[in-house]
Amino acid sequence: MKILWIDLNSSYAHSSLALPALHAQIASNQDIEWIKVSATINENIGMIVDSIYRHHPDILAATAWLFNHEQLLHICTRLKALLPQSCLILGGPEFLGDNEAYLRNHPFVNCVFRGEGEEAFPQWLSCWNQPEQWAHIPGLCYIDSQQQYKDNGIARVQNFQALVPPEESYFFNWDKPFVQLETTRGCFNTCAFCVSGGEKPVRTLPIEQIRERLQLIHQHGIRNVRVLDRTFNYNTRRAKELLQLFLEFSPDIRFHLEIHPALLSEELKEELKQLPQGLLHLEAGIQSLHAPVLERSRRMGKLEDALEGLKFLCSLPNMETHADLIAGLPLYHLSEIFEDIRTCL
């Protein structure tokens, strides 16, 4: 079996964890040949198609994002015309909703995957060429032989701690200026604009397991780690444990964290004050300074607490903090966005 992964990014500075995360789970399977073709959304589509076509894969797979979806469709349309026997499966945040219209409008897409794939994708590979057996694959959406839409819900990894880390895949890219590290999956918050909103319970990795992964990252000389946790400080005790762990790698590694300024406990504030210069780069999730916008978006946390927390973070001389505002949220008008920018400045 030959799987070709279409790695389509906005630039070569960016890389996705999707391929190494999936490959790591079944890397020992000698019956599978993996190929990756990397490209950017600004490259010539014909050249990309040609570089893929020459491999004649059994399976074409890719992750669709907002920024690459249009170009990916153009590529896949041409590929399926040239390789009609190849099975095309797509995944990613673009498929978190109802996928029936998408599949009917793009019949060359054999199936799309909704949710977390590390456990379910290997299941699908065991029957990829037997669509009559797809009904038991969590997260898979497809049109069956009777032209009926089949929706297998959303896939959730049942044993997060047991996953093989993506760093152990030979597709993991150590050449980028930073690497991404996931220490939790899911989020306590319910933000309507986030793909993890309401994804409970939050699943965590043990501190010792994270330490081992950071040691490997350190051995590769990586200087910057972007922690992918949706809300680093959702739990004060765990946040403090992670900060103590990060200190073990200071000053060699700098950590980028997403933090909710409305949820800063006094205990965590004191911890942040004591950290060495440059250990952290904080991304404070403000999103909007207008309460109706936050309420409609179902974002938890009082606005007054968020402003107070942001002021505290910006006052810390030992770390860099930037605040996030999200244009396009419901009830969020352009004039209010400019007003919020002025307030933050």
PLM features: residue spans?
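Nucleotide-activated donor-dependent transferases that construct or modify glycoconjugates
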Residues: 2-11
